[in-house]
């Protein structure tokens, strides 16, 4: 993989050409962006273009010859460790199934990729070295020539210099030139030797003289707040990540509510007393029962009772009176009410008069006093007669506690507006709704679940508000009756911002921090991206913040102070979740008027009038992205206070019409809610930031040139070290720039606050069926693919076809051609979409069967509606209850479907398309998620996953991603991982490791069919990361050495050849597993199994353990491979080949590269396995099959099933333990000591293991399983950055040692050397105070426990909390133990100032001032000084030969003393301390350099 970069312009050209190709509109699988058609495949091609040797413009636009270039990187499957034989279940033998532990899989594959990267970079380095060597030769020639000329001039001038001063001065100048040239020649010569060593294949580079090459040395990675995260920076980011602090550095106090409570009581004590008196008076009147129940409470403490005593009587008579009399009475009562209000105001204190004056009769329905222009109608005045004035006053003024309760479902009010009427009023296609809601068995009751009605109808809003006011008053009276003073004080922030206490206390700590952060943005007149991971309650944080703004009623400068509290607000969201927003607003803060600007809203008049009404009453307008674009002119006509984009990544295309429409709002208060703020590339991140903070990241062309291209190029696996470091620096700068305005918390960081259940996400690699394999291969070999590869045809059609074949071959071929008139029962296998023709559907069938028995509930996602239709037919045939929602489901019926599924536990499956069901939908009723096919955009699949694993979920969630091994879906999955790594590089960790080998066009259209002994390409790429999943097993779980029972099974297998295996024995094992059903809870193998950690122990165990498991490999008709007469398993895949004997090859394949970076040679491997020849030869005659056909499987079932029942009662109780069948033993489990709180987790884990065991045990087409989270979370820092940091640390340590040695006196002086406590020679300058013990407090050294500001940018090795406390380099700590109490000498002060400046000045400036440092004081000590001294002393005095040591001696001495993290530093220290050479015998010798002898 040579480093062949391709200009960015070619990528753009390719994208333009790709975008010009039309894409099918009938398929949701068509790969395009909603926001502007920015295709994912175009991203894929543009990213893979680096290093593939093929012009992207030739790929998409012009015809070109087939690819010619270096060989592609092929992952060697033999180097990935599969399940150890001792760890395999008995049922797995003969099935051809490989199971991987996810960590091992990921590490192993990454090791292979790293090796390939290393080899490619080595080849690239050699090319660069050759060029550099030629340049050095030119410089050498030029320098030698110049030196000769200078010598001639000196020879000519020397005789005349004694007689002429001018000539003497010229001669001195020429001599200085000669000296400079000589120095330059030394450097060039040293560089030449260095390059010669590289070109000559030397294993260790010749170290140059640092003094001579100091100017040419490349500066180490900058100082270094960046290379390794400092302690203070880590603590800072940890507080932000865990939701305890905002990015601006403010934290919410632990006991914040007490202080505001006292303030509120002091400020409004009279008003609180008034409310208490009124509530008490109302309670006494109700208790008397004297028809005074509806008497009004005047605002004054003393209320004249006469005018309101008989209020309830007219209400009873009003039902009989005529309308005119009724209206007359209402007018009289209204006048009385106003008179009482004005009369009561006379007696109020002056402090309350301005507040009371806001309570205009016109705004009674508008509880927030938001300048509503609404006047109540006469029909509503009857409702107002039942309203209590004190409740409205309570709402607007006090901060009393109100427990949120759902609105009562019964009663006359709700009967007036039935759900059927709501749906039919504002969506005409009710027939489609009924059909969508009643899909599946027992689906007729879907229409009973209603959506939350919005407040487009102001009458409804007034009624809802009055009901809420009544509930508040009733609740307050109840608390007063019980003398419950549990009212929560408001949460107060800076500048008068308050959040109602009852609302704020219900937020999690990280959500409270989010509200605080939103307020800080508000004060700065800036927008922000709330990027919390999906399911962490971003909606609630926004509602709480908006409620706080409205509740505080403060004017801010952002809108020229024209809005008191909260002004009109626009919320743009996907259509699926519009009514979800309404529900949340009505639940958390009912006073808001929330209207939906959409066809599904309750407003039936012109949309323009709704926009005007909401803007004037300062309400909340919820609309969709399409309406923002369509009604852009009408909406932008008004001044909006806040614009909030839910799922704001919809505007990720900066040139899309919807993006430009959203950016035209005239307000600085812009908020984006997105769980995936960066999905594909940095261009999308720029688009989002340009909305919330225009100009923050400059213009797009400049941003792309300065940030996007360097960061992206540095993320490729074949990037040069310069590109890697450049990408790191740019990522650090970009991260620091956007950090304050992007708040992102992950579930893993706030999991303790949420009490979220565990999530288990795995990737199932499914085998293609024979028919799928044939169709796929035929298409790959077709003319269409040839034309695509030649650039004569666009790539989209080919990719879509491949994805269809992976899902189901009938989607591509159209299915079997059937004759008319044949009965349906005979056409089952020939029907379109028959499930046994798709490998993934076979897996789904097994999953659903197991989960249905366990009582789990499932979400089944697919990209394609056609695939959903096939799955729907399958579910009907299997008699499963289900619901379905796709793009054709009407907006009006989506929320009722979601609500129904969450509430009705009898519905087993919910079928959804990934895009429709993946945005903002809350489906916590399910705890199992199946993603049937992957999407190019990783956030699309992530959104689907997060539907179930979010706040409100009580059960453990299991997510299965289905991929077909060796097909285009694996390439899509790789692309997802690369995009996620790119996102992490900017948003999370700039040191994110590189990935993504440069896939080219040819590689997309290939098919690799891994068999049982082969691993998938993904498994190979991520080997060693622990992503492979071991097969769960019920037997042979605890054996570490070969079991005794296995030895006794050997003669049995020798006595009975494979052709004579009893069918009854084969069936009995399956009968047992089926009889157990869902109650069997398999236990997974321990991930810390010594067999996995120690390859040598693994090799010693494999033979006998595999022997014991091979004896019972055939366990049932569904698991049987077709056994031929000679005892070998026949191969039904059509290739006519059989895999190698598992005892000889497969174990070696899996152990080859799992633990070593360099694979052992073939000769070593063969020699290793020669010792195992006698142990393994007895089953060499047996082979595993790669695939087996469904037809042969069904043939066996027909012959074996009649014999199952008689054997069931006889053998179902006898299970095997340690390889021996124990009479009456039903089953066994591993004994585990676990606490009571861990039992439920173990049970859930056992359920997942049981599912995996069944998947692997049956011939359901599962090839292997990987753990997705281990891939995403297990990425280590980039090795180039680690090496650079290790080199820098080593240079600092050597510099400190060199200076220290210069300060020490020789042996002839007789002065003891400084030991840290005693001695004089070489002691720090601070120890040489000889002029008194006086101490100046202004210049004394701070105690080491105090936190120094330099800790934020210290450049030592990162010290994490909970880890070993080692002294940091440049930590600001004192150099000696007693310096805190002694005076600070001037030399020591200068030393500390220079140490501080070392973090700021460039290295070249430090080198220039090096002589000053040497003359004055030492650099502060580093944590590696002791190691360096120990290394030097060992090589100088303790090795076999003084002054030098062999590599073997050094390893024996230091290998046990070093941790893995110290290896890089140790290597650099050794290279700088010694020179290396090899003896004639090939032994490596390290010899101390003269200055360290």
UniProtKB/Swiss-Prot annotation:
<feature type="compositionally biased region" description="Basic and acidic residues">
    <location>
        <begin position="1352"/>
        <end position="1376"/>
    </location>
</feature>
<dbReference type="GO" id="GO:1905168">
    <property type="term" value="P:positive regulation of double-strand break repair via homologous recombination"/>
</dbReference>
<feature type="region of interest" description="Disordered">
    <location>
        <begin position="1042"/>
        <end position="1147"/>
    </location>
</feature>
<dbReference type="GO" id="GO:0016887">
    <property type="term" value="F:ATP hydrolysis activity"/>
</dbReference>
<keyword id="KW-0209">Deafness</keyword>
<keyword id="KW-0805">Transcription regulation</keyword>
<dbReference type="GO" id="GO:0006362">
    <property type="term" value="P:transcription elongation by RNA polymerase I"/>
</dbReference>
<dbReference type="GO" id="GO:0006281">
    <property type="term" value="P:DNA repair"/>
</dbReference>
<dbReference type="GO" id="GO:0140463">
    <property type="term" value="F:chromatin-protein adaptor activity"/>
</dbReference>
<keyword id="KW-1017">Isopeptide bond</keyword>
<keyword id="KW-0347">Helicase</keyword>
<dbReference type="GO" id="GO:0010332">
    <property type="term" value="P:response to gamma radiation"/>
</dbReference>
<protein>
    <recommendedName>
        <fullName>DNA excision repair protein ERCC-6</fullName>
        <ecNumber>3.6.4.-</ecNumber>
    </recommendedName>
</protein>
<dbReference type="GO" id="GO:0045739">
    <property type="term" value="P:positive regulation of DNA repair"/>
</dbReference>
<feature type="modified residue" description="N6-methylated lysine; by EHMT2">
    <location>
        <position position="448"/>
    </location>
</feature>
<keyword id="KW-0547">Nucleotide-binding</keyword>
<keyword id="KW-0524">Neurogenesis</keyword>
<dbReference type="GO" id="GO:0034243">
    <property type="term" value="P:regulation of transcription elongation by RNA polymerase II"/>
</dbReference>
<dbReference type="GO" id="GO:0006366">
    <property type="term" value="P:transcription by RNA polymerase II"/>
</dbReference>
<comment type="subunit">
    <text>Homodimer. Binds DNA. Interacts with ERCC8. Interacts with RNA polymerase II; interaction is enhanced by UV irradiation. Component of the B-WICH complex, at least composed of SMARCA5/SNF2H, BAZ1B/WSTF, SF3B1, DEK, MYO1C, ERCC6, MYBBP1A and DDX21. Interacts with KIAA1530/UVSSA. Interacts with ELOA and CUL5; the interaction is induced by DNA damaging agents or by inhibitors of RNA polymerase II elongation. Interacts (via WHD region) with RIF1. Interacts with SMARCC2/BAF170, SMARCB1/BAF47 and the neuron-specific chromatin remodeling complex (nBAF complex).</text>
</comment>
<feature type="compositionally biased region" description="Polar residues">
    <location>
        <begin position="1123"/>
        <end position="1141"/>
    </location>
</feature>
<keyword id="KW-0832">Ubl conjugation</keyword>
<dbReference type="GO" id="GO:0032784">
    <property type="term" value="P:regulation of DNA-templated transcription elongation"/>
</dbReference>
<dbReference type="InterPro" id="IPR014001">
    <property type="entry name" value="Helicase_ATP-bd"/>
</dbReference>
<keyword id="KW-0158">Chromosome</keyword>
<dbReference type="GO" id="GO:0140658">
    <property type="term" value="F:ATP-dependent chromatin remodeler activity"/>
</dbReference>
<dbReference type="GO" id="GO:0140664">
    <property type="term" value="F:ATP-dependent DNA damage sensor activity"/>
</dbReference>
<dbReference type="GO" id="GO:0006284">
    <property type="term" value="P:base-excision repair"/>
</dbReference>
<feature type="region of interest" description="Disordered">
    <location>
        <begin position="1318"/>
        <end position="1384"/>
    </location>
</feature>
<feature type="compositionally biased region" description="Basic and acidic residues">
    <location>
        <begin position="353"/>
        <end position="363"/>
    </location>
</feature>
<feature type="compositionally biased region" description="Basic residues">
    <location>
        <begin position="1327"/>
        <end position="1336"/>
    </location>
</feature>
<dbReference type="GO" id="GO:0031175">
    <property type="term" value="P:neuron projection development"/>
</dbReference>
<dbReference type="GO" id="GO:0008023">
    <property type="term" value="C:transcription elongation factor complex"/>
</dbReference>
<dbReference type="GO" id="GO:0045945">
    <property type="term" value="P:positive regulation of transcription by RNA polymerase III"/>
</dbReference>
<keyword id="KW-0898">Cataract</keyword>
<keyword id="KW-0539">Nucleus</keyword>
<feature type="compositionally biased region" description="Basic and acidic residues">
    <location>
        <begin position="1211"/>
        <end position="1221"/>
    </location>
</feature>
<keyword id="KW-0227">DNA damage</keyword>
<dbReference type="InterPro" id="IPR000330">
    <property type="entry name" value="SNF2_N"/>
</dbReference>
<feature type="compositionally biased region" description="Polar residues">
    <location>
        <begin position="1337"/>
        <end position="1351"/>
    </location>
</feature>
<keyword id="KW-0488">Methylation</keyword>
<dbReference type="Pfam" id="PF00176">
    <property type="entry name" value="SNF2-rel_dom"/>
</dbReference>
């Amino acid at each position: 993989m040579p480093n062949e970069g391709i200009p960015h312009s070619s990528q753009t050209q390719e994208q333009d050409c790709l975008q010009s190709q039309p894409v099918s509109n009938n398929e949701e699988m068509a790969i395009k962006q909603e926001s502007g058609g920015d295709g994912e495949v175009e991203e894929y091609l543009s990213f893979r273009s680096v290093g593939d040797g093929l012009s992207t413009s030739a790929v998409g636009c012009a015809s070109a010859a087939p690819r010619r270039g270096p060989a592609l990187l092929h992952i060697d499957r033999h180097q990935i460790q599969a399940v150890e034989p001792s760890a395999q279940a008995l049922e797995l033998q003969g099935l051809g199934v490989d199971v991987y532990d996810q960590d091992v899989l990921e590490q192993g594959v990454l090791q292979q990729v790293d090796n390939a990267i290393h080899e490619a970079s080595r080849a690239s380095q050699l090319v660069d070295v050759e060029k550099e060597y030629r340049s050095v030769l030119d410089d050498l020639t030029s320098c030698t020539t110049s030196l000769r000329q200078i010598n001639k001039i000196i020879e000519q001038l020397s005789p005349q210099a004694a007689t002429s001063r001018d000539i003497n001065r010229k001669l001195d100048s020429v001599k200085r030139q000669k000296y400079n040239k000589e120095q330059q020649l030394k450097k060039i010569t040293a560089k030449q030797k260095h390059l010669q060593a590289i070109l000559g294949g030397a294993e260790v580079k010749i170290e140059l003289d640092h003094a001579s090459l100091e100017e040419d040395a490349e500066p180490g990675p900058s100082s270094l707040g960046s290379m390794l995260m400092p302690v203070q920076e880590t603590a800072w980011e940890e507080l932000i990540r865990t939701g305890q602090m905002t990015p601006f550095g403010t934290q919410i106090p632990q006991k914040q509510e007490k202080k505001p409570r006292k303030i509120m009581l002091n400020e409004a004590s009279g008003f609180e007393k008034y409310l208490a008196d009124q509530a008490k008076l109302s309670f006494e009147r109700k208790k008397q029962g004297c028809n005074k129940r509806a008497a009004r409470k005047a605002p004054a403490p003393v209320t004249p009772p006469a005018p309101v005593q008989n209020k309830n009587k007219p209400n009873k008579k009003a039902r009989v009176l005529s309308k005119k009399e009724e209206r007359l009475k209402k007018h009289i009562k209204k006048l009385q009410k106003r008179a009482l209000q004005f009369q009561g105001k006379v007696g109020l204190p002056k402090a309350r008069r301005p507040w009371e004056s806001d309570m205009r009769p016109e705004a009674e329905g508008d509880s927030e006093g938001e300048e509503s222009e609404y006047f109540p109608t006469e029909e509503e005045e009857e409702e107002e007669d039942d309203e209590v004035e004190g409740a409205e006053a309570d709402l607007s003024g006090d901060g009393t506690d109100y427990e949120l309760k759902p609105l009562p479902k019964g009663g006359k009010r709700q009967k007036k507006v039935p759900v059927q009427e709501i749906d039919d009023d504002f969506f005409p296609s009710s027939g489609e709704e009924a059909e969508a809601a009643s899909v599946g068995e027992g689906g007729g009751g879907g229409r009973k679940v209603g959506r939350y009605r919005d407040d487009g109808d102001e009458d409804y809003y007034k009624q809802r508000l009055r009901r809420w006011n009544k509930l508040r008053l009733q609740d307050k009276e109840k608390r007063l009756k019980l003398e419950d003073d549990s009212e929560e004080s408001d949460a107060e922030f800076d500048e008068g911002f308050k959040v109602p206490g009852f609302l704020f206390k219900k937020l999690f700590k990280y959500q409270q921090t989010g509200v605080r952060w939103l307020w800080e943005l508000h004060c700065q007149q800036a927008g922000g991206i709330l990027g919390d991971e999906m399911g962490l309650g971003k909606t609630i944080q926004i509602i709480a913040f908006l409620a706080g703004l409205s509740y505080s009623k403060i004017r801010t400068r952002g809108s020229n102070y024209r809005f008191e509290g909260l002004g009109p607000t626009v919320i743009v969201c996907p259509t699926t979740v519009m009514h979800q927003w309404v529900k949340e607003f009505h639940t958390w803060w009912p006073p808001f008027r929330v209207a939906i600007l959409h066809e599904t809203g309750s407003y039936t008049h012109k949309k323009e009038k709704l926009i005007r009404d909401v803007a004037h009453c300062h309400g909340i307008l919820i609309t969709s992205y399409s309406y923002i674009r369509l009604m852009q002119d009408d909406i932008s006509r008004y001044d909006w206070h806040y614009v909030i984009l839910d799922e704001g990544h919809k505007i990720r295309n900066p040139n899309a019409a919807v993006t430009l429409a959203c950016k035209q709002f005239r307000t600085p208060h812009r908020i984006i809610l997105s769980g995936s703020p960066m999905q594909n590339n940095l261009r999308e991140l720029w688009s989002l930031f340009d909305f919330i903070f225009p100009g923050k990241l400059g213009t797009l062309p400049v941003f792309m040139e300065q940030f996007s291209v360097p960061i992206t190029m540095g993320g490729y696996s074949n990037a040069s070290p310069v590109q890697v470091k450049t990408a790191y620096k740019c990522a650090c700068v970009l991260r620091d720039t956007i950090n304050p305005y992007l708040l992102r918390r992950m579930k893993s960081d706030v999991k303790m606050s949420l009490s979220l259940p565990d999530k288990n996400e795995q990737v199932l690699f499914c085998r293609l069926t024979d028919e799928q394999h044939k169709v796929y291969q035929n298409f790959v070999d077709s003319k269409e693919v040839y034309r695509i590869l030649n650039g004569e045809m666009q790539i989209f059609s080919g990719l879509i076809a491949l994805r269809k074949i992976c899902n189901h071959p009938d989607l591509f071929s159209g299915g079997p051609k059937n004759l008319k008139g044949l009965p349906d029962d005979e056409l089952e296998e020939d029907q379109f979409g028959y499930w046994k023709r798709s490998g993934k559907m076979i897996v789904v069938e097994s999953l659903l069967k197991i989960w249905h028995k366990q009582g789990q509930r499932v979400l089944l996602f697919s990209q394609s509606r056609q695939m959903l239709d096939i799955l729907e037919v399958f579910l009907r045939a299997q008699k499963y209850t289900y619901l379905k929602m796709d793009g054709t489901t009407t907006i009006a019926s989506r929320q009722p479907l979601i609500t129904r599924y969450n509430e009705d536990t009898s519905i087993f499956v919910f079928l959804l398309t990934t895009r429709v069901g993946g945005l903002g939908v809350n489906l916590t009723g399910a705890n199992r998620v199946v993603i049937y096919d992957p999407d190019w955009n990783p956030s699309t699949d992530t959104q689907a996953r997060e539907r179930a694993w979010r706040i409100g979920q009580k059960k453990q969630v299991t997510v299965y991603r289905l991929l077909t091994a060796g097909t285009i879906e694996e390439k899509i999955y790789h692309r997802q991982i690369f995009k996620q790594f790119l996102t992490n590089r900017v948003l999370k960790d700039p040191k994110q490791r590189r990935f993504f080998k440069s896939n080219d066009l040819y590689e997309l259209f290939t098919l690799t069919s891994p068999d049982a002994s082969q691993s998938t390409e993904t498994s190979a790429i991520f080997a060693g990361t622990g992503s492979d999943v071991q097969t769960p097993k019920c037997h042979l779980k605890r054996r570490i050495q070969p079991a005794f029972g296995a030895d006794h099974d050997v003669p049995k297998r020798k006595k009975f050849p494979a052709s004579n295996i009893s069918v009854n024995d084969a069936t009995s094992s399956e009968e047992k597993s089926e009889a157990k059903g869902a109650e069997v809870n398999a236990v997974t193998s321990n991930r810390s199994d010594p067999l996995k950690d120690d390859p040598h122990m693994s090799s010693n165990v494999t033979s006998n353990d595999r022997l014991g498991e091979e004896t019972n490999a055939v366990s049932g008709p569904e698991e049987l491979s077709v056994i031929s007469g000679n005892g070998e398993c026949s191969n039904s895949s059509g290739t006519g080949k059989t895999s190698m004997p598992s005892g000889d090859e497969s174990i070696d394949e899996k152990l080859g590269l799992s633990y070593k970076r360099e694979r052992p040679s073939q000769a070593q491997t063969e020699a290793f396995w020669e010792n195992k020849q006698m142990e393994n030869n007895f089953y060499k005659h047996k082979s595993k099959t790669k695939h087996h056909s469904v037809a042969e499987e069904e043939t066996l079932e027909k012959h074996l099933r009649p014999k199952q029942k008689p054997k069931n009662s006889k053998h179902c109780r006898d299970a095997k333990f340690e390889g021996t069948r124990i009479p009456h033993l039903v089953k066994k489990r591993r004994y585990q000591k676990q606490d009571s709180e861990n039992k439920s987790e173990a049970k859930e884990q056992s359920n997942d293991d049981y599912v995996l065991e069944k998947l692997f045990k049956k011939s359901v087409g599962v090839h292997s399983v990987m753990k997705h989270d281990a891939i995403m979370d297990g990425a280590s820092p980039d090795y180039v950055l680690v090496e650079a940091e290790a080199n820098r640390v080593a240079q600092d340590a050597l510099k400190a040692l060199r200076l220290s040695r210069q300060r020490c006196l020789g042996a002839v002086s007789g002065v003891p050397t400084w030991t840290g406590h005693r001695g004089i020679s070489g002691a720090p300058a601070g120890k040489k105070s000889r002029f008194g013990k006086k101490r100046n407090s202004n210049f004394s050294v701070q105690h080491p426990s105090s936190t120094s500001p330099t800790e934020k940018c210290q450049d030592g090795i990162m010290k994490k909390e909970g880890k070993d406390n080692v002294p940091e380099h440049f930590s600001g700590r004192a150099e000696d133990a007693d310096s805190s109490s002694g005076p600070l000498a001037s030399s020591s002060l200068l030393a500390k100032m220079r140490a501080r400046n070392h973090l700021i000045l460039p290295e070249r400036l430090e080198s220039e001032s090096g002589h000053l440092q040497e003359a004055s004081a030492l650099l502060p000590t580093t944590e590696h000084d002791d190691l360096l001294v120990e290394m030097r002393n060992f090589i100088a005095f303790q090795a076999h030969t003084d002054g030098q040591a062999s590599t073997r001696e050094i390893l024996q001495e230091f290998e046990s003393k070093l941790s893995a993290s110290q290896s890089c530093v140790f290597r650099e220290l050794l290279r700088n301390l010694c020179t290396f050479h090899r003896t004639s015998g090939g032994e490596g010798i390290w010899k101390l350099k003269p200055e360290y002898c």
